[in-house]
Amino acid sequence: MSESLEKPVVKIALGIEYDGSKYYGWQRQQEVRSVQEKLEKALSQVANEPINVFCAGRTDAGVHATGQVVHFETTAIRKDAAWTLGVNANLPGDIAVRWVKDVPAEFHARFSATARRYRYVIYNHRLRPAVLSQGVTHYHLPLDAERMHRAAQCLIGENDFTSFRAVQCQSRTPWRNLMHINVERFGAYIVVDIKANAFVHHMVRNIVGSLMEIGCGNQPESWMAELLAAKDRTLAAATAKAEGLYLVSVDYPAQFELPKPPMGPLFLAD
């Protein structure tokens, strides 16, 4: 077939949300459920051709997202409704497309991103929850959110996060630029809101695990700064559970004009 008859390739970005509790993480793997596999299957049905997607951040097993961003290339010409309503009709109920946007060839969901933002939701009550039990992390001891917030501020800026990095992390460097970290109580819920240019493996959950030790009084506020300086993962607290973690937003240069829907999760304001 001559080049003039070849179908043009278009690049499309999607905003995705999912409840990760029934998935073995984002990344497609053999013989286990993954969000990527379900999304690619649904997109391929709508496009009537194989679709491969690239995401902004690969979430672990049990982790959720309200603001995941993906891109893919296709020769299929479809209306926006096909990439939203049509794809959603082919997805399981715990995965959904939130928006669609045509993007230029130079856009990449991962490499064009300038920052990622996560929220970690703790249900701080003596008794465990039933409703939303897979969407929050239960912690039974009383936590002082203001104390946790003060302790966390030492993490802001460019730092070596070795003390909060999983042993199996494959990143070339432990250095990350943490832009903000806020800890706030909403009734029985505590939300840790954290934004950085990127994250080392388990960074958010390891930070939260140590903050909870401070919040319940087991460690002083100064402990976070000591851990950061020590650059030793074995000194920090255990990794917090996956259930309470949400990827809520990914930042991109303004030139791409990507939608910015409410981050959530649920009723949490931006």
UniProtKB/Swiss-Prot annotation:
<dbReference type="InterPro" id="IPR020094">
    <property type="entry name" value="TruA/RsuA/RluB/E/F_N"/>
</dbReference>
<dbReference type="GO" id="GO:0160147">
    <property type="term" value="F:tRNA pseudouridine(38-40) synthase activity"/>
</dbReference>
<keyword id="KW-0819">tRNA processing</keyword>
<protein>
    <recommendedName>
        <fullName>tRNA pseudouridine synthase A</fullName>
        <ecNumber>5.4.99.12</ecNumber>
    </recommendedName>
</protein>
<dbReference type="GO" id="GO:0031119">
    <property type="term" value="P:tRNA pseudouridine synthesis"/>
</dbReference>
<feature type="binding site">
    <location>
        <position position="118"/>
    </location>
    <ligand>
        <name>substrate</name>
    </ligand>
</feature>
<dbReference type="InterPro" id="IPR020095">
    <property type="entry name" value="PsdUridine_synth_TruA_C"/>
</dbReference>
<keyword id="KW-0413">Isomerase</keyword>
<comment type="subunit">
    <text>Homodimer.</text>
</comment>
<comment type="function">
    <text>Formation of pseudouridine at positions 38, 39 and 40 in the anticodon stem and loop of transfer RNAs.</text>
</comment>
<dbReference type="Pfam" id="PF01416">
    <property type="entry name" value="PseudoU_synth_1"/>
</dbReference>
<dbReference type="InterPro" id="IPR001406">
    <property type="entry name" value="PsdUridine_synth_TruA"/>
</dbReference>
<dbReference type="InterPro" id="IPR020097">
    <property type="entry name" value="PsdUridine_synth_TruA_a/b_dom"/>
</dbReference>
<dbReference type="InterPro" id="IPR020103">
    <property type="entry name" value="PsdUridine_synth_cat_dom_sf"/>
</dbReference>
<comment type="similarity">
    <text>Belongs to the tRNA pseudouridine synthase TruA family.</text>
</comment>
<feature type="active site" description="Nucleophile">
    <location>
        <position position="60"/>
    </location>
</feature>
<dbReference type="GO" id="GO:0003723">
    <property type="term" value="F:RNA binding"/>
</dbReference>
